[in-house]
């Protein structure tokens, strides 16, 4: 390989790497990369990642955690984890995908074959997410369709599904006494449990299939399929709408929320700092797990999306911007949620602690109840559930896309052919839909809670995050990875990122992981229903099935490799030689930088080709 310098008439000298005579480029490899596809532009990548990480948790989990854990004081542990775990691991996964141009499994296999189980574990978590996360979209679609009525069906107690215990608060506020309130239920709760879920007495009784929910689930899967069936070329176009539309809805709901009576009191409850809460280790655990949940860390999605970037894309700048965007969205969503909860508390004459909810309880009980108290309630109901649908939709189809990417990179000769991608997505969609039918039975809510509590729990994500940063910083080498990043973006990231990879992130993850185990409490539905022992066994199977991949594949790869233990260990911790190596740049002042070989660009390296921090 020879370095040649050309001096154009109207520009600076250009330095490129060209093959010497007789030296051939790997045409087959180029075709494979070309077939794999890339983002058309940076905005498609940014919006796709934003769509993945900014989801339902920003609206229904973060505001409640902030209120529950000391209001404004919660931001102290939150931002400690944000800078020491969130940004470093987020950037690590995106940079890994961009550097290797591979999905989650093959990226880790190329970096360190011994720890390829990290990628397989993320695929297991992705698979679980694809089965149960989309159920929320089915519920939201059901509520959206139910909102197109002259009167919202969860407003009154005169419907066929209501019981004699139903009490409409708005029309009978003076009829209920303190001694009898426990015997009554609200029309909102009865609509949720009796009309939507048809919930049974426990997981032992799954009951019949809720056909309306099954059809809503089918519609959700059809939308997801056609959003991604042609690869990143279609996904990149769809996210222009799906990732930005929720922000429009959020702004509209924010304006409406802060103009409601009682909104100010709700916001005060949301932000009022209680520094004494920082003494509680649970507050710190909630902050850490929220970072991992909301940043989609250890799910393989960031690696897969980063793998479609151009080699010299400034993924460092993108990662920092996306992390701040995610947290800012969570913060803004808190104003929407608590302004409306404050209004609802004032209307009912209740303390805000009695109306504050998180998770599905906020989306399908608290907020529907709030809109019944507003003028034009059907309009606000439609806007809210449309926002929920779009928040969940792009997270869902990006998650499916990442599973498809991982599969195609693992078996390129079989799957990267004409028409195979569409069939693979169809197979995944059909399988996940059929599996999801168990979650839209009358007892499906109990199964959904098991998936949500165990399959993608904070324990699983913390466990994988520890191995990710240990693999990159201690096995592959933090300095070596910094060299690779410098080769891609043109400069070395802030030293705190490397310090976090080496010490802070694994230390905090380990401490939070151990504390999570010590504070483990078995799942209870609505804090009342206790699962049978076999139900908890299913939950722990869901949790351990991902975590076991890491040690299991360490053992398998060691047993399959020949030679002494030391030789096998050295071989299995050696990166794939096909990975791009940092190259020697010729600078305009005649100096050179330390380097080893060409990077995988199609036209050669040109001075000024990289994005810079400027």
UniProtKB/Swiss-Prot annotation:
PANTHER family: SODIUM- AND CHLORIDE-DEPENDENT BETAINE TRANSPORTER (PTHR11616:SF118), SODIUM/CHLORIDE DEPENDENT TRANSPORTER (PTHR11616)
Family recorded in the similarity comment: Belongs to the sodium:neurotransmitter symporter (SNF) (TC 2.A.22) family. SLC6A12 subfamily.
Name of the molecule in the record: Sodium- and chloride-dependent betaine transporter
Positions with biased composition (Basic and acidic residues): 21-33
This protein's record includes keyword Transmembrane: yes
UniProt keyword annotations, A-Z: Cell membrane, Disulfide bond, Glycoprotein, Membrane, Neurotransmitter transport, Symport, Transmembrane, Transmembrane helix, Transport
One annotated GO biological process: neurotransmitter transport
Membrane-side (Extracellular) residue stretches: 138-210
UniProt tissue specificity: Kidney.
Gene of this entry: SLC6A12
Side Cytoplasmic, residues: 1-44, 557-614
InterPro entries documented for this protein: Na/ntran_symport, Na/ntran_symport_betaine, SNS_sf
Chief subcellular location: membrane
GO-annotated molecular function: gamma-aminobutyric acid:sodium:chloride symporter activity
Cysteines paired by S-S bonds: 157-166
Membrane topology: Multi-pass membrane protein
Description of how the protein assembles with itself and partners: Interacts with LIN7C.
Region feature Disordered, mapped onto this chain: 1-33, 591-614
Reactions that this protein is recorded to catalyse: 4-aminobutanoate(out) + chloride(out) + 3 Na(+)(out) = 4-aminobutanoate(in) + chloride(in) + 3 Na(+)(in); glycine betaine(out) + 2 chloride(out) + 3 Na(+)(out) = glycine betaine(in) + 2 chloride(in) + 3 Na(+)(in)
Residues with attached carbohydrate: 171, 183
Xref: PROSITE patterns: NA_NEUROTRAN_SYMP_1, NA_NEUROTRAN_SYMP_2, NA_NEUROTRAN_SYMP_3
């Amino acid at each position: 390989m020879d370095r040649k310098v050309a001096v154009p008439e109207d520009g600076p000298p250009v330095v490129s790497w060209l093959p010497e005579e007789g030296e051939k480029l790997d045409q087959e490899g180029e075709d494979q990369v070309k077939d794999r596809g890339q983002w058309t532009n940076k905005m498609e990548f940014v919006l796709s990642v934003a769509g993945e990480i900014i989801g339902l948790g920003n609206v229904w989990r973060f505001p409640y955690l902030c209120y529950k854990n000391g209001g404004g004081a919660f931001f102290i542990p939150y931002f400690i984890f944000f800078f020491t775990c969130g940004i470093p691991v987020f950037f690590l996964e995106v940079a890994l995908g961009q550097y290797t141009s591979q999905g989650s499994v093959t990226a880790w296999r190329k970096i360190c074959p011994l720890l390829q189980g990290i990628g397989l574990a993320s695929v297991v978590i992705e698979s679980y997410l694809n089965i149960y996360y989309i159920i929320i979209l089915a519920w939201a679609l059901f509520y959206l369709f139910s909102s197109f009525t002259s009167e919202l069906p969860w407003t009154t107690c005169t419907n066929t599904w209501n019981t004699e215990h139903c009490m409409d608060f708005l029309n009978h506020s003076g009829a209920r006494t303190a001694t009898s309130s426990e015997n009554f239920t609200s029309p909102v709760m009865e609509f949720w449990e009796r009309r939507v879920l048809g919930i049974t007495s426990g997981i032992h009784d799954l009951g019949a299939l809720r056909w309306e929910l099954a059809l809503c689930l089918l519609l959700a899967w059809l939308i997801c399929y056609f959003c991604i069936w042609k690869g990143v070329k279609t996904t990149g176009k769809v996210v222009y709408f799906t990732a930005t539309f929720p922000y429009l809805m959020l702004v509209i709901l924010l304006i409406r929320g802060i103009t409601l009576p009682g909104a100010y009191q709700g916001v005060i409850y949301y932000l009022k700092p209680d520094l004494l809460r920082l003494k509680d280790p649970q507050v710190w655990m909630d902050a850490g797990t929220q970072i991992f949940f909301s940043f989609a860390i250890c799910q393989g999605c960031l690696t897969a999306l980063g793998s479609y970037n151009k080699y010299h894309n400034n993924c460092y700048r993108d990662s920092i911007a996306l992390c701040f965007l995610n947290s800012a969205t969570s913060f803004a969503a808190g104003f929407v949620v608590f302004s409306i909860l404050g209004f609802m508390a004032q209307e009912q004459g209740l303390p805000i602690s009695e109306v504050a909810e998180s998770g599905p309880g906020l989306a399908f009980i608290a907020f529907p109840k709030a809109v019944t108290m507003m003028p034009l309630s059907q309009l606000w109901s439609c806007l809210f559930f449309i926002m929920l649908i779009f928040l969940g939709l792009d997270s869902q189809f990006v998650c499916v896309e990442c599973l498809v990417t991982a599969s195609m990179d693992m078996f390129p000769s079989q799957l990267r052919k004409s028409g195979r991608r569409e069939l693979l997505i169809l197979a995944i969609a059909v399988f996940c839909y059929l599996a999801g039918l168990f979650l839209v039975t009358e007892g499906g809510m109990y199964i959904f809670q098991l998936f949500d509590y165990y399959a993608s729990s904070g324990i699983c994500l913390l466990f994988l995050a520890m191995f990710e940063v240990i693999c990159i910083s201690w096995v592959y080498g933090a300095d070596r990875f910094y060299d690779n990043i410098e080769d891609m973006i043109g400069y070395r990231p802030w030293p705190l990122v490397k310090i976090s990879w080496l010490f802070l992130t694994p230390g905090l993850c380990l401490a939070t992981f151990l504390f999570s185990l010590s504070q483990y409490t078995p799942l209870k539905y609505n804090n009342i229903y206790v699962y049978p022992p076999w139900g908890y066994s299913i939950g722990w199977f869901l949790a351990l099935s991902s975590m076991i991949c890491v040690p299991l594949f360490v053992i398998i790869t060691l047993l399959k490799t020949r030679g002494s233990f030391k030789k096998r260990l050295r071989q299995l911790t050696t990166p794939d030689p096909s990975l791009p190596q940092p190259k020697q740049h010729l600078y305009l002042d005649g100096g050179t930088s330390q380097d080893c070989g060409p990077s995988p660009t199609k036209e050669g390296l040109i001075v000024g080709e990289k994005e810079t921090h400027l």
